[in-house]
């Protein structure tokens, strides 16, 4: 018997479809978490390398003393002066965005789990 010719019961097909959708929603959420973040009118990178640089810069700026600034290249290649507090606020903005994304993901996941048709599943997105 060729396994490719086996037809799963409709309920199983829907369950698999839901699992795929939830996996895609999670991937979308994770990708949005590392998108550039807006602060003071500029976009800042927030991938793993950028996070390391931001954290190192905060330490350096704190060590340099109150009011210290460094030149920072934004996502769009603008050079701006930032303080340790600016960099902390960027991290805070990311935390707020991350919380929203996780909340929206959980709600979308619940909707997928409650859906009774593939069409219902297809309509579900991460809406911020």
Where are these regions (language model features)?
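A preference for well-ordered globular domain cores
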Residues: 1-128
């Amino acid at each position: 018997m060729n396994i490719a010719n086996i037809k799963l019961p409709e309920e199983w097909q829907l369950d698999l479809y839901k699992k795929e959708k939830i996996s895609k929603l999670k991937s979308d959420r994770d990708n949005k978490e590392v998108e550039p973040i807006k602060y003071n009118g500029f976009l800042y990178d927030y991938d793993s390398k950028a996070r390391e640089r931001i954290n190192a810069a905060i330490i350096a700026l704190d060590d340099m003393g109150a009011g210290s600034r460094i030149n920072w290249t934004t996502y769009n290649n603008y050079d701006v002066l930032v303080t340790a507090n600016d960099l902390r606020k960027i991290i805070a903005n990311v935390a707020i965005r991350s919380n929203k994304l996780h909340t929206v993901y959980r709600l979308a996941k619940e909707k997928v789990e409650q859906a009774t048709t593939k069409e219902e599943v297809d309509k579900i997105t991460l809406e911020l």
